[in-house]
């Protein structure tokens, strides 16, 4: 089966203790921040004891090693146009491991005989729709149903793949589209921000409602 390929993006990931955060910092919600050259996602982990900071940007290093040690100075220099409050927040991170963002080839097989790959192993995707783990859970649900119907045979795996491919491809396409939107350069980013400012939260949620409406 074909291996993973580099998507051209990388993710810098760092943890900040909650007690080091500025007073009043929102530790209840996930925050998505668009900036020049990158985007950031902030969300609480470990029952709110830490803030996980993830900064995604285009990568010059196309190696597949997992992960490499990031240079905080290089990262902060790349974010020099960002708001000072965000740069100060990122300065609280002690270590920045850098992960290459990988994808699996679209046309690769998901099973061979009675052996199968599911989740990221079969269809690793960009994290820009936050659906990689969810697709793995759905895979398991559908695979269990096909094994119940066909037994532990190759037919079960063939049926599972036929049922899953169309939906997974649609989610992969959405993640890639989000990546293009998140990393738009000037002046397209100005138009993006204008449209976003005129869009209600309900309409934004509706854009991905088809994902959450899925039934096995």
For each predicted feature, which ranges?
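Conserved FAD-binding catalytic core of PHBH/FMO-like flavoproteins
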Residues: 1-88, 93-94, 107
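Alpha-helix N-cap and coil->helix boundary residues
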Residues: 7, 152-155, 190
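Conserved mid-domain beta->alpha element of the FAD-binding
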Residues: 12, 42, 74, 95-181
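Residues at secondary-structure transition points
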Residues: 66-70, 131, 151, 186
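Alpha-helical structural elements of signaling/regulatory helical domains
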Residues: 81-85, 149-152, 166, 187
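Short, hydrophobic secondary-structure boundary micro-motifs
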Residues: 87-90, 169-172, 206-208
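C-terminal domain-closing interface element
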Residues: 182-201
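C-terminal auxiliary extensions adjacent to catalytic cores
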Residues: 196-216
């Amino acid at each position: 089966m074909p291996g993973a390929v580099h998507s051209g993006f990388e993710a810098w990931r760092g943890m900040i203790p909650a007690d080091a955060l500025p007073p009043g910092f929102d530790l209840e919600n996930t925050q998505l921040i668009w900036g020049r050259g990158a985007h950031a996602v902030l969300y609480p982990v470990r029952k709110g004891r830490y803030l996980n900071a993830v900064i995604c940007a285009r990568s010059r290093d196309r190696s597949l090693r997992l992960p490499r040690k990031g240079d905080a100075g290089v990262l902060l220099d790349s974010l020099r146009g960002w708001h000072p409050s965000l740069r100060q927040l990122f300065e609280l991170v002690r270590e920045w491991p850098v992960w290459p963002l990988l994808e699996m080839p679209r046309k690769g097989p998901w099973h061979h005989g009675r052996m199968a790959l599911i989740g990221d192993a079969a269809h690793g995707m960009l994290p820009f729709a936050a659906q990689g783990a969810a697709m793995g859970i759905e895979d398991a649900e559908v695979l269990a149903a096909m094994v119940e119907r066909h037994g532990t045979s190759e037919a079960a795996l063939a049926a599972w793949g036929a049922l899953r491919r169309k939906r997974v491809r649609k989610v992969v396409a959405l993640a890639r589209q989000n990546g293009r939107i998140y990393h738009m350069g000037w002046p397209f980013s100005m138009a993006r921000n204008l449209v976003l400012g005129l869009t209600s939260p309900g309409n934004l949620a509706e854009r991905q409602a088809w994902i959450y409406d899925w039934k096995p």
